[in-house]
Amino acid sequence: ALRVGVTAPFMLVKLLKPYFNEGASIVNISSSRDAMSQAQSESYTAAKGGIHALTHALAISLAGIARVNSISPGWIETTDKKYDGPDALQHPVKRVGRCEDIAEMILFLCSEKAGFITGENIKIDGGMSKLMIYHDEDGWKYQ
């Protein structure tokens, strides 16, 4: 996972650097798993965290040459299978992400509108990583 997830993007940037045009933008794809884990997912989580770290390091190394950002998607529907019911309802936005949600952010980050954004990792997960999960706990009630 580390060779593909971290070494490959690093080597590609090194190889392609002479060909970057003015205003170049690099968008790496990480995962919301860069900050969350499940048992037996150490290699994947480390690779995704590595992409996040590589992104901010490259943003400094390539300053004035290219802007470098990353996106960390959460659950994204990538097939004809639709996630609904509990899968969708557990997200604060009440749906699972779509490929278009990621594509639109990539287009934005590559545009001049994002000209002052570099070194950032943008999590696109419908708020899932912000949701605290406690069973039988409704939080604090304002009275």
Predicted regions and their residues:
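Alpha-helical segment proximal to the catalytic Tyr-Lys
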Residues: 18, 60-64, 115
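Active-site loop immediately N-terminal to the catalytic Tyr-X3-Lys motif
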Residues: 23, 36-42, 94, 112
